[in-house]
Each structure stands twice: as C-alpha cells, then as structure tokens.
C-alpha cells in the first residue's frame, strides 16, 4: 500500500505541471507593454527583488513594476541609449548589465551610477554585459561580449579578467552550480563548455561525449536543475542535457528533427522534471522524463495568446507566477492561481515600456522585476 501511495505521489508530481498547461487553447496570457507604462516592448532581462518589485530591463532603460504602476529609471549620462542585458540584486544594490558595461542602482539614494573599477592591468568593463551571477564566496561574475569574463570580489573590491582569447572574448553565460563550481559557455569560434580550475585559477574546456552525431554546443544559456543535471540551450542545436561529472551529453529538441527549438534564450525549472524554455519559436514546456513538450506561441486571432513568439527571459516570482520577456511584445504573465498569462507592451503613452523587444528579465533582492528592450523606433 505504501509503495502504491509513493507511486501515485510520483505520478502526480510529474503530471501536475503538465495539467496546468494542458489546455493550451484555453491559456490566457496577460500582456504588459508600452501601453501599460513600459519604456519598450523589447525585454532582455527580468528580476524580482526582496521587496517584491519586478525589475524589467529593456532596450530603452530600466523599469520597475510595483503591481500597479511602472516607473522608468534612467542611466547617468546615457541619454536614450540604455539597452539593458542583465540584472542581479545583492548587497542592497542592483547590478545592471548594459551594452556599455555595468551600472549600479542604490536603493538608499535611488541613484544609478556606472561601475568604474578597473583590473590590476587597468582594464574596465566597457562592452555588453549579458549575464551576472554570484558565487558562495561573495564574488560577482560578469560575462561580456568581447572582453571575456570578469570576477569581482565584493569583500576585497578586486576585479579580475579571464580573457578567453580563443573565443575572442565573446562569452554567452556563466553558471555557479550547487557545489560552487563555476561554468562558462561561448557560442563563438571554439564553442563549448568551460569549467574553472580553481587551483590554477583558469577556465579549461570541459569535454563532452555525445550519444549521436549532433556534436556542437553553441550554447547561449545554462541551467542546473534540482537533480544537479546541467542543461544547455543552444543557438541551433536544440536543448542539451549534460552530466557534469562524466561529460555525457544528450540532445533534445534539435531543429532538424522537425519538432525542435531554434535559438534558445532561456531555461527555467518550472517544477521537477519540467523545463520552461524561451526560444525564437515561442515558449516550450518540456518534460525531461517523457521527452514530450508543449509549444505556446503568438496567435493573431487570439488576443490572449502569447504576445510575441520571440521569448527571452523567464522567471518565477515569489508567489509562483511566471513572467516572460519577449523581443517585440513586452512582458507576459501567467498567474499561479488562474493559469492565465498577462503581458506588458509598448504604447504612445509616457508611462509605457520603451519598445516591443524584450531581451532579459531579472528579479532583485527587493522582489522587483527588471527587464531590457530596444527603442520602439527600431522595431
């Protein structure tokens, strides 16, 4: 009897996330766009902080949503050129990755100032900073497009650069896993997966062993799930499952299979064995046990469908709601209670998002959601 109960509980654990999304035709996405106050509909980053605010990074600046209204924050001396790629909250500050380096938002003063610290070789972070994470040793890790990876020790105030010359410094993402191991990926040149050798303080290629002939790992994003498996979302090779100890690699959702996903921009563990995947084909819910998936995309005949199929950041808020940033359709939301999506989009009103393209989302320590997007003039 106990064995049967455990089996039933296991089946429910596997099936409940799919049940929520099962009636795809009935899903109602709530949309938030420039018409609702976003500065742009192009969202690159999302984050909720410890206060519950949602911060939204767009190509036209930083937005904060308090559940009712959207507030726009400007970066010092940047004018309208405020494309935001990444957001991270720590030490009562928000670290903002832009196309021209890093800015810092101070909660006490509400000022946003540039991060001007240089390495011992007088190197400043001056290029697109597309990902920010923190390890257990209080180091912040920044991936850049052109300058490799930087490590900032928040205790000693020391900045260090890892150049990745073989990849021309074009890094896609960095991951701190459950064991405080640092991983990095690039999708340029000698694309692949790298692991930090802490003893020698250098990144080394982590060899992968694929089961099939699809061997490229031109990854854009990484995730470690609750079972400590690594997942890579790639540009043109689908979703890849990586055993971080053996290097065994398995490919799923490869575009050439006719049922895959192209240009995966985000991966989030929605529930055990359930991954939400943002891609240029829409939003996918992938079951890692059955290898089945559901695809949600925009439908011009359905005003409550996903606002745009180009899905970038995905986060889960403190209440279990899902926020989705899109490249042209602002922010979409699905409530944990109603199973309905909401969206935020760009409009002619001054309190709307700046554009229709959303690149990334991030939640800060106050519970605020941050996102990035480009100018409506460019969409």
What are these model-derived regions, one by one?
Residues 1-377:
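Carboxylate-rich, polar loop motifs that coordinate divalent cations or form catalytic acidic clusters
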């Amino acid at each position: 009897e106990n064995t049967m109960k455990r089996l039933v509980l296991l089946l429910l654990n596997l099936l409940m996330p799919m049940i929520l999304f099962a009636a795809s035709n009935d899903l109602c996405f709530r949309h938030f766009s420039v018409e609702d106050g976003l500065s742009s509909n192009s969202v690159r980053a999302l984050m909720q902080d410890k206060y519950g605010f949602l911060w939204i990074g767009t190509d036209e600046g930083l937005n904060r949503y308090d559940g009712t209204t959207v507030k726009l924050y400007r970066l010092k001396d940047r004018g309208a050129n405020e494309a935001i790629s990444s957001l991270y909250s720590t030490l009562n500050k928000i670290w903002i990755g832009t196309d021209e380096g890093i800015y810092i938002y101070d909660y006490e003063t509400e000022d946003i100032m540039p991060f001007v610290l240089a390495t011992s070789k007088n190197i400043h972070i001056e290029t697109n900073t597309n990902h920010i994470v923190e390890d257990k040793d209080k180091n912040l890790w920044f991936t850049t497009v052109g300058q490799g990876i930087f490590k900032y020790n928040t205790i000693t105030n020391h900045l260090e650069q890892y150049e990745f010359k073989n990849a021309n410094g074009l890094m896609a993402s960095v991951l701190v896993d459950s064991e405080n191991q640092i991983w990095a990926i690039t999708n340029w040149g000698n694309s692949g997966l790298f692991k930090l050798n802490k003893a020698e303080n250098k990144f080394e290629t982590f060899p992968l062993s694929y089961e099939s002939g699809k061997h490229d790992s031109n990854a854009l994003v990484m995730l470690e799930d609750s079972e400590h498996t690594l997942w890579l979302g790639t540009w043109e090779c689908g979703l890849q499952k990586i055993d971080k100890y053996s290097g065994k690699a398995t490919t799923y959702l490869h575009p050439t299979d006719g049922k895959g996903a192209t240009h995966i921009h985000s991966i989030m563990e929605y529930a055990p064995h359930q991954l939400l995947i943002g891609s240029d084909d829409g939003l996918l819910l992938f079951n890692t046990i059955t290898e089945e998936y559901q695809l949600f995309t925009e439908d011009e005949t359905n005003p409550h469908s996903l606002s745009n199929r180009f899905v970038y950041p995905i986060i889960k808020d403190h209440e279990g709601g899902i926020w989705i940033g899109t490249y042209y359709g602002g922010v979409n939301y699905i409530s944990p209670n109603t199973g309905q999506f909401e969206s935020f989009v760009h409009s002619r009103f001054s309190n709307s998002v700046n554009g229709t393209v959303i690149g990334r989302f991030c939640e800060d320590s106050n519970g605020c959601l941050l996102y990035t997007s480009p100018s409506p003039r460019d969409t």
